[in-house]
Amino acid sequence: IFNLSQDAELINGTYGIYYKIQQIALFSCFRLSNTLISLLAFNIGLNNKDRIKECIKWGIIDTVIVAGIITIIFEVLAGPISKLFGLTTTGENKGQIITLCETSIRIASIGYVFMGISLAIQGILQAYRKALSPLLISTLRLIIFLVPVSLIFVRQSNVVNLVWWAFPIAEALTAVLSILILKFTEKIIAVKKEKQVI
């Protein structure tokens, strides 16, 4: 994505730092998603409809809350976090990279709440023993939405600041589709259960 001649080194250096920082948010949400899989799968096995609904509701809410807290922390501490993770950066662009990293954190972390929704729904779908739907959601987040949106921003003159908007946009679009996929999956499961009763 970042093959931009004069801005390439700056963006690649910044992305290298941002990627490490993003993992904090990503893995925090993954832990909740993995916990949700176990709890929800257990209640699906018991066919406890009330507990299933509660697990889904609170699984999504808890993941969004954690993602929201991380977003607030990153927005407030973007500067110190960038400097901390940028300690290993060398070269004449070090100051620019750290400044740009601060910008990238402030912009990209807006999408963490949407990422929390998507990751929680991936966990829910895995608990329902659906393997392809979570894979589709990951592909939407990381490739199908992110790459085209990034390519649009890459063509702009202020690419070093604009390209980071690709992350929250891709996360928001993925969250919307994740919700639709979950609703569709729940309808299919309900229809199958009705047929089994008949």
Residue map of PLM features:
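Membrane-helix interface segments
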Residues: 8-11, 131-133, 159-160
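Transmembrane alpha-helical segments of integral membrane proteins
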Residues: 119, 145-154
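Small-residue-rich hydrophobic transmembrane alpha-helices
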Residues: 15-78, 115-137
